[in-house]
C-alpha cells in the first residue's frame, strides 16, 4: 500500500479514513450551519503522491474555501498523514460513484458519553484555527502568551506555572491560548492525555454522572489526565456541588504533578460565590492578565488575519477597523470577516468608504465616542487632581503620572494622532506623548494593580 495515499473505504467499513476524519473535524470546529453552507457539498476525488484533490460544486464555493479555510484543511490532512503537502480544490461535474461526501450526525460535546470521553479522540475538541503561530503578541497579552507557551513546551510533567490562571474580558484571547496549548501538546507529545472543556460542560458531565450513577468513572476520567484545562471557571460560582468536585479534582491533579490551566473573566480574588479554599488554590501558580488590546495590537491582529486569508485590504480601511473596533479581538475579527464577505459576494474591492458603510450599523450599536477631554476628566477625578493639571507644565509625580496615564488612554481609546493628543495636554510635543505612552506600557508589565486600574477606567469610558 502506498502510504502517501489517502484510502477512502466504504462507509460501512469500521476503519476510520482520513477524509471522514477531516470532515468530522471541520464539522466540530465550525458547527453545523457553517459546515452545511461550505463543506457539506465538497467531495474527495483522489490523492496522488503528496497532493489531495477535492471538488467544490461551484466556483464561488471553491474560491471562498480557498481564501478562508485552505490552511485549516491542509493542517487537518497533515495531522492524519504528514506526507500531504498540498490540497487542491477544483470544480467539475462528477458521476455519483466518484463522489465521497459525508453525512454527519448532529452532536454537541454535551451529548458525548463517558466511553467516548475516555477515548483518545480528545484532539477533536481543539480548534485548529487557534495556534501559537497565529496568536498575535503585544504588550497586553505577552505574559499570558509566554506562560501558555511554557506550559505547552514543558519537558517535565508540569511547568513552573501550575496552575496557570488566565483572566481578562471576553474575546481577548484566553480561549485561543488554551486551544493552542492543547493543539501543541497533541502534535508534539501525543501520548499525553489532555482535556479542555468549559466549566459549564464540566458541570454538565458531573450532573450527568450523578444521575447515571457513574461518579467513579467521572472522577477517574478527569483525575487521570496529564493536562486539564477548564475555561470560564466563573460559571461554577454559586454551584456548591460542582465546586466540591472541582476542588477535589484540582487537589488530586496538583498532588500528582499534573498540569492545570484555568481561564476566567476576573482575577481569583474577585470571584464571588466561590469557596475561599478554591480561590486560594487558583492563585497558587501564575496569574496572568490578558487585558484590553492596544491600537498597535489590533493593527497586528488585522494584518495577520488578512495575510492568512490572502485578501487585499487598503491601509486606510485597516486603520479604520483598528481605531473603531476596540471592544475585543472577537468583534474585531468579526468586523473584518463581514467586510471581506461583502466584497466576495458583491465582487467589489474593499475601500475605506465601503468599509464604513458595511459596518455602519455595527458601529452605531457600539457607538460611544470617547474624547481626550472625557479621558482627562475621568483620570483627574480618579487621582484627585485638578483638570487644569492635565495641561500644566508641573512635573510632580502625583500629577505627572496621572497625566501620562491619560495620554496612554487617549492613544488607546481615540483615533487622535500623537500631535493632536499633545495639543490637548498643554501643547506638548509629540515626543513627550510617546515617552508617556512608553512609560505606562513599561509599568503595565510589572504593576498588576495599575493594570487592573487602567482596565477598569477603560471599561467605564467605553460603556
Curated annotation (Swiss-Prot):
SUPFAM superfamilies: P-loop containing nucleoside triphosphate hydrolases (SSF52540), TrpR-like (SSF48295)
Keyword terms of this UniProt record: ATP-binding, Cytoplasm, DNA replication, DNA-binding, Lipid-binding, Nucleotide-binding
Residue ranges of coiled coil: none
Main localization category: cytoplasm
Entry-linked InterPro entries: AAA+_ATPase, Chromosome_initiator_DnaA, Chromosome_initiator_DnaA-like, Chromosome_initiator_DnaA_CS, DnaA_C, DnaA_dom, DnaA_N_dom, DnaA_N_sf
Residues that span the membrane, as ranges: none
A biological process from GO: regulation of DNA replication
Gene this protein is translated from: dnaA
Quaternary structure (record): Oligomerizes as a right-handed, spiral filament on DNA at oriC.
Region of interest: Domain II: 84-124
Family matches, as CDD domains: AAA (cd00009), Bac_DnaA_C (cd06571)
GO cellular component assignments: cytoplasm; plasma membrane
Region feature (Domain IV, binds dsDNA): 344-463
Protein name stated in the entry: Chromosomal replication initiator protein DnaA
SMART domains assigned: AAA (SM00382), Bac_DnaA_C (SM00760)
Keyword ATP-binding (UniProt): yes
Domain notes: Domain I is involved in oligomerization and binding regulators, domain II is flexibile and of varying length in different bacteria, domain III forms the AAA+ region, while domain IV binds dsDNA.
Gene3D superfamilies in UniProt: 1.10.1750.10, 1.10.8.60, 3.30.300.180, P-loop containing nucleotide triphosphate hydrolases
Any GO molecular function: ATP binding
Similarity comment text for this entry: Belongs to the DnaA family.
Subcellular location: Cytoplasm
Pfam families the UniProt entry points to: Bac_DnaA, Bac_DnaA_C, DnaA_N
Segments for region (Domain III, AAA+ region): 125-343
Role: Plays an essential role in the initiation and regulation of chromosomal replication. ATP-DnaA binds to the origin of replication (oriC) to initiate formation of the DNA replication initiation complex once per cell cycle. Binds the DnaA box (a 9 base pair repeat at the origin) and separates the double-stranded (ds)DNA. Forms a right-handed helical filament on oriC DNA; dsDNA binds to the exterior of the filament while single-stranded (ss)DNA is stabiized in the filament's interior.
Positions contributing to ATP binding: 171, 173-175
Region (Domain I, interacts with DnaA modulators): 1-84
Source organism of this protein record: Rickettsia bellii (strain OSU 85-389)
Source superkingdom: Bacteria
Amino acid at each position: 500500500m502506498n502510504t502517501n495515499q489517502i484510502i477512502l473505504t466504504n462507509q460501512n467499513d469500521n476503519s476510520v479514513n482520513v477524509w471522514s476524519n477531516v470532515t468530522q473535524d471541520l464539522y466540530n470546529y465550525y458547527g453545523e450551519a457553517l459546515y452545511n453552507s461550505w463543506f457539506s457539498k465538497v467531495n474527495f476525488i483522489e490523492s496522488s503522491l503528496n497532493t489531495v484533490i477535492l471538488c467544490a460544486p461551484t466556483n464561488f464555493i471553491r474560491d471562498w474555501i480557498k481564501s478562508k479555510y485552505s490552511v485549516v484543511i491542509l493542517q487537518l490532512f497533515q495531522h492524519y498523514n504528514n506526507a500531504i503537502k498540498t490540497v487542491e480544490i477544483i470544480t467539475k461535474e462528477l458521476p455519483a460513484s466518484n463522489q465521497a461526501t459525508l453525512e454527519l450526525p448532529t452532536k454537541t460535546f454535551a451529548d458525548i458519553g463517558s466511553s467516548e470521553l475516555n477515548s483518545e479522540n480528545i484532539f477533536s475538541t481543539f480548534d485548529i484555527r487557534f495556534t501559537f503561530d497565529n496568536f498575535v503578541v503585544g504588550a497586553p497579552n505577552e505574559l499570558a502568551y509566554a506562560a501558555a507557551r511554557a506550559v505547552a513546551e514543558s519537558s517535565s510533567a508540569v511547568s513552573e506555572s501550575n496552575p496557570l490562571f488566565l483572566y481578562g474580558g471576553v474575546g481577548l484571547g484566553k480561549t485561543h491560548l488554551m486551544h493552542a496549548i492543547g493543539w501543541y501538546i497533541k502534535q508534539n507529545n501525543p501520548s499525553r492525555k489532555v482535556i479542555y472543556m468549559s466549566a459549564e460542560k464540566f458541570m454538565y458531565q458531573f450532573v450527568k454522572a450523578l444521575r447515571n450513577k457513574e461518579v467513579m468513572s467521572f472522577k477517574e476520567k478527569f483525575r487521570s489526565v496529564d493536562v486539564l484545562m477548564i475555561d470560564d471557571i466563573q460559571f461554577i460560582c454559586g454551584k456548591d456541588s460542582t465546586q466540591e468536585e472541582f476542588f477535589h479534582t484540582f487537589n488530586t491533579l496538583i498532588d500528582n504533578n499534573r498540569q492545570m490551566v484555568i481561564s476566567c473573566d476576573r482575577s481569583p480574588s474577585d470571584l464571588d460565590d466561590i469557596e475561599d479554599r478554591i480561590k486560594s488554590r487558583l492563585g497558587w501558580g501564575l496569574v496572568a492578565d490578558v487585558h484590553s488590546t492596544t491600537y498597535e495590537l489590533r493593527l497586528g491582529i488585522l494584518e495577520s488575519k488578512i495575510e492568512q486569508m490572502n485578501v487585499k485590504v487598503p491601509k486606510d480601511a485597516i486603520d479604520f477597523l483598528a481605531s473603531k473596533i476596540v471592544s475585543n479581538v472577537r468583534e474585531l475579527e468579526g468586523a473584518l470577516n463581514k467586510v471581506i464577505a461583502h466584497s466576495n459576494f458583491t465582487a467589489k474591492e474593499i475601500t475605506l468608504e465601503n468599509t464604513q458603510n458595511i459596518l455602519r450599523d455595527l458601529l452605531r450599536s457600539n457607538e460611544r465616542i470617547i474624547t481626550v477631554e472625557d479621558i482627562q476628566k475621568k483620570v483627574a477625578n480618579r487621582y484627585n487632581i485638578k483638570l487644569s493639571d492635565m495641561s500644566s507644565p508641573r512635573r510632580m509625580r502625583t500629577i505627572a503620572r496621572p497625566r501620562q496615564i491619560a495620554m496612554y488612554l487617549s492613544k488607546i481609546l481615540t483615533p487622535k494622532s500623537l500631535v493632536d493628543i499633545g495639543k490637548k495636554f498643554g501643547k506638548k510635543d509629540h515626543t513627550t506623548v510617546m515617552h508617556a505612552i512608553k512609560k505606562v506600557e513599561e509599568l503595565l508589565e510589572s504593576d498588576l494593580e495599575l493594570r487592573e486600574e487602567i482596565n477598569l477606567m477603560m471599561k467605564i469610558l467605553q460603556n
